[in-house]
Amino acid sequence: MTTRQVEHEYTIGAPAATVYRLLADVSHWPQIFPPTIHVERQATGAHQERIHIWATANGQAKNWTSRRTLDPEALRIDSASEVTTAPVAAMGGTWIVEPLGADSSRIRLLHDSGPSPRPQDLQWIDRAVDTTRHLELAALATTSNHAHAAEERELLSFTDTCTIDGAAKDVFDFVNEADRWPERLPHVATVRFEEPAPGLQILEMDTRAKDGSVHTTKSYRVALDTRKIAYKQVTLPALMTLHTGVWTFTRRPGHHRGELAAHRLHQHANIAKIPRRAGQVADARDYVHSALSTNSRAPWASQG
């Protein structure tokens, strides 16, 4: 059997340098690409890196490791898999960004996958590649356009920090063991929890609001040692189009500091339903910040 190759192409109304920068910086991929949950990066040489990606494919949570070679002069990024997850045996690809003018560019995505002896695996891979790449290219176009036009009003980022007396591992375990939250957190009614691979978690929970209403949220989470837990919420209220965050845990003498860092989300344009003066962007930002900050501090409050 031979290697299977596919090419996708997309035209974007943004400078080639802007598009390339978004592709090169994997730290922002969870905010750019809908399938991407979290990415860890390790530099391995000049313009060389190894990345560990957690993402969804055909609705399933997967993870894999790839090595990448970046060529900022040619606006080209080559990648090849080092560790894959079934049914993928091997996978690689190339991003090529071609300038079409001062404010437009063409993206070419060349993708190849290794042979598989089972027809159903080939069908699964073809469907995953086609769906994922179309989502990624469309999302990249949207993000590139926003980055070129400046989107500060729509992006909200904040950090909450709490200091807790106790062992670092105990606090990490409390956040990590989300399946036990109904017995530990009063606002959590029920939890549906899966861990398809070590450290890769699917968390769906029903929470009670102060008015007694119950809301369902679903998130993918990645637990890394006892250092941090990254998450991406995929069921969102009308006010938001994106919600990602990272719990980071930093040990201090006699204390454990739990820090919710890089908590990023995009606010939806329709903000008229917030329980304050309708239609005010500043009010929407304050409301969302307050709500998320309260939720993020709930586990710490119960540990205090």
UniProtKB/Swiss-Prot annotation:
Top-level taxon: Bacteria
Lineage: Bacteria, Bacillati, Actinomycetota, Actinomycetes, Kitasatosporales
Keywords: Antibiotic biosynthesis
Function as written in the Swiss-Prot or TrEMBL entry: Is needed for correct cyclization of the oligoketide leading to isochromanequinone formation.
Descriptive protein name: Granaticin polyketide synthase bifunctional cyclase/dehydratase
Pathway note: Antifungal biosynthesis; monensin biosynthesis
An example Gene Ontology biological process: antibiotic biosynthetic process
Signal peptide as annotated in the record: none
Keyword ATP-binding: no
InterPro entries: Polyketide_cyclase/dehydratase, START-like_dom_sf
